[in-house]
Structures are given as structure tokens and as C-alpha cells.
Amino acid sequence: MLSNLMSWQITLQIALAAAVIGYLLGSIPFGLILTRAAGLGDVRSIGSGNIGATNVLRTGNRKLAAATLLLDALKASAAAWIVGYFLGEEAAIIAGFFAFIGHLFPVWIGFKGGKGVATYIGTLLGVAPIMVVLFAAVWLAVAVTTRYSSLSALVAMLVIPVALLILGNEKVAAVMAIMTVISYWKHRANISRLMGGTESKIGAKG
């Protein structure tokens, strides 16, 4: 996979343009914008302090959390689609990756963003859409079995690069593998709680 990353034909100028566009789109903090617009205050002051959909759900507004999830996914998809249309497939992959980075480390709010699950899915939708079906299937299977949302996402993110590699899509597999590693790092507190048996389950109160 690493050798495939080195064999890309994209020029430095196009790669930089794709990265900047992707990052700026990914940096839009929809969770924060929506909760403030709804009069629910600063989502960073509750729960985990995260701007993602899971923390928005802690406000008690399910519709707002769903909207956050959708918009956080679509900003990565939009980055890949727009850049891909004008600059090509490799640029689309780069744009999706940097939209993911932008969500995790948004320039507008001090580089403190989400954990990247929604933008991971959005990037998949933009560059390898059939893989979204696999992600959803794995997530659902693990969630039904364990009732851990975080574990479901972690397992799904582990499966995706392997599946892409098996299917011969090595460029996307390599990038998604890097995104998986980064998201695992962002989920390190969840992983610690999972190992300690203290992670909250889906539907748990308090």
C-alpha cells in the first residue's frame, strides 16, 4: 500500500489545492453551528466536549444530532466530489482525506474537533461509495451484538481498508488505513473505557 502512495501521478500544485479545499470544508464545525443556532449553547461545554454528532445527541435533540452526522459526512463527500470533478480521482482522495483532518483539527475553533467517524464515512461515499454499505453492515452487526457505538465504528474502520485492498483499490485503501489509525488515536479514551468495561452502551441512561 505504501508503495502505491508513492506512485501517484498527481502534481504537487493540484495536490495542495485539493488539500486546502478539503481541509477548509472539513473544518466547518456543523455540530457547534447547529447547537448554537438551536439555542442549545456551546456543545463543547457538555459531555466529551466534542463537536461531533454523538456529543450533540447529549443535548437531547436527536434531530440535531442526525443533522450534524449528515452534514459532517456530506462535507467530506462534497470535498471529494467537487475536487474530483475538476481535478481528478487522485485529487478527490486527497480532498476527502484532508476534509477528515479538517474535522478533527478545525482551524476555526482552535484545532479541537471531532473524532472523525462521520467524515470517514463521507470520504468513503465520495471515493468508494459501495464501501459505505459494508461500513454500515459491520457497524450494525457489532452494535446489535455488543451495544457499543464506539466499538462498532472502530471495527468498521478496521474492516474497510482490508476490504479495499482485497478489491484492488490500493490507493484508497492506503489513505483509509491512515485515517483509521488517526481515528483510533482520537478514540483512545473510548478504547481505554472499552478495555476497562466502563464505556457507555447504546441506550444506556446517564
From Swiss-Prot:
It comes from the Bacteria. Its EC number is 2.3.1.275. This is Glycerol-3-phosphate acyltransferase. Belongs to the PlsY family. Pathway: Lipid metabolism; phospholipid metabolism. The chain crosses the membrane at residues 14-34, 67-87, 91-111, 124-144, 148-168. One of its GO terms (molecular function) is acyl-phosphate glycerol-3-phosphate acyltransferase activity. GO terms for biological process: phospholipid biosynthetic process. One of its GO terms (cellular component) is plasma membrane. PANTHER family: GLYCEROL-3-PHOSPHATE ACYLTRANSFERASE-RELATED, INNER MEMBRANE PROTEIN YGIH. It comes from Rhizobium etli (strain ATCC 51251 / DSM 11541 / JCM 21823 / NBRC 15573 / CFN 42). Probably interacts with PlsX. It catalyses: an acyl phosphate + sn-glycerol 3-phosphate = a 1-acyl-sn-glycero-3-phosphate + phosphate. It is a multi-pass membrane protein. It is found in: Cell inner membrane. The keyword DNA repair does not apply.
